[in-house]
C-alpha cells in the first residue's frame, strides 16, 4: 500500500494505491467521501480516494504519506464510517534497508548493467543495477518493492533487458540526501551497518 496527499496540487483528497490497474480495467464505486477503485475483471480492490481527508485526518506530508499502524487504523475507520466493508492489512516493514552485495555479475544482454545478489536481512534479492561503482562486498541502500522514492517513483518488480529485478540499489541523489555527489554512482555505506537494518534519511 502507498498513500499520497497533495492538497495544493490535487485538493483535499488522500490517494491510496494498493496495486496497478489499467484504464480499460478500471471500475469504481462511491461510498460517501470514499471512492473505491477496483479491477473490473478480477473485482480486486486496487485503491481508494478519500475526499475531504482533512476532516478525518491530520496529514503533514505533501506527497508520499508515511505509513504507520495508527494511520492504517485511521484509514480503516474512515472506510467503515463511509460504508466500505473492507479492512486494509498492510506490510509496515521498512522499505529502505541496508543491503550487502554478495555477488555482482555482468548482465548477459547489456554492457552497462550488472546483476547483483543483495542480502537485505531476511532474504536475498536479485537487483539489476546500472551504477558503474557497484561491487561485491559493499553495503548499500536498497529500496525494496513497494518503496516510494523522494521523486514519487514507486519501486516495483521489473525485468531489465530480460533479467528479473526486485528492488533498486540507490544513489545519494535518488535518496535526495543533502550534498549528494553529481557524478553517477550508488551510495556505498561505511560503518557498522547490518544487512536488513532500516535506512533512515
Curated annotation (Swiss-Prot):
CDD domains per record: tRNA_bind_bactPheRS
Pfam family, one: tRNA_bind
PROSITE patterns: TRBD
Record domain tRNA-binding: where: 90-200
Gene3D superfamilies the UniProt entry points to: Nucleic acid-binding proteins (2.40.50.140), YtpR-like (3.30.1940.10)
Alphabetical list of SUPFAM superfamilies matching this protein: Nucleic acid-binding proteins
Top-rank taxon, per record: Bacteria
Keyword vocabulary terms for this entry: RNA-binding, tRNA-binding
Transmembrane segments: none
The name this protein goes by in its record: Putative tRNA-binding protein YtpR
Organism of provenance: Bacillus subtilis (strain 168)
Amino acid at each position: 500500500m502507498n498513500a499520497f496527499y497533495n492538497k495544493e496540487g490535487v485538493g483535499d483528497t488522500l490517494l491510496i494505491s494498493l496495486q496497478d490497474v489499467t484504464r480499460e480495467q478500471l471500475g469504481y464505486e462511491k461510498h460517501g467521501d470514499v471512492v473505491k477503485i477496483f479491477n473490473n475483471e478480477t473485482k480486486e480492490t486496487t485503491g481508494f480516494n478519500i475526499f475531504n481527508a482533512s476532516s478525518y485526518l491530520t496529514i503533514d506530508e505533501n506527497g508520499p504519506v508515511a505509513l504507520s499502524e495508527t494511520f492504517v487504523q485511521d484509514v480503516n475507520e474512515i472506510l467503515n464510517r463511509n460504508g466500505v466493508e473492507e479492512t486494509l492489512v498492510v506490510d509496515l516493514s521498512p522499505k529502505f534497508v541496508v543491503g550487502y552485495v554478495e555477488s555482482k555479475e555482468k548482465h548477459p544482454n547489456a554492457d552497462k548493467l550488472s546483476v547483483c545478489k543483495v542480502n537485505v536481512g531476511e532474504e536475498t534479492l536479485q537487483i539489476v543495477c546500472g551504477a558503474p561503482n557497484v561491487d561485491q562486498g559493499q553495503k548499500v541502500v536498497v529500496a525494496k518493492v513497494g518503496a516510494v522514492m523522494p521523486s514519487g517513483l514507486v519501486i516495483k518488480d521489473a525485468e531489465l533487458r530480460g533479467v528479473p529485478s526486485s528492488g533498486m540499489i540507490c544513489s545519494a541523489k535518488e535518496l535526495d540526501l543533502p550534498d549528494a555527489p553529481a557524478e553517477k554512482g550508488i551510495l556505498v555505506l561505511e560503518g557498522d551497518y547490518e544487512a536488513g537494518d532500516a535506512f533512515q534519511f
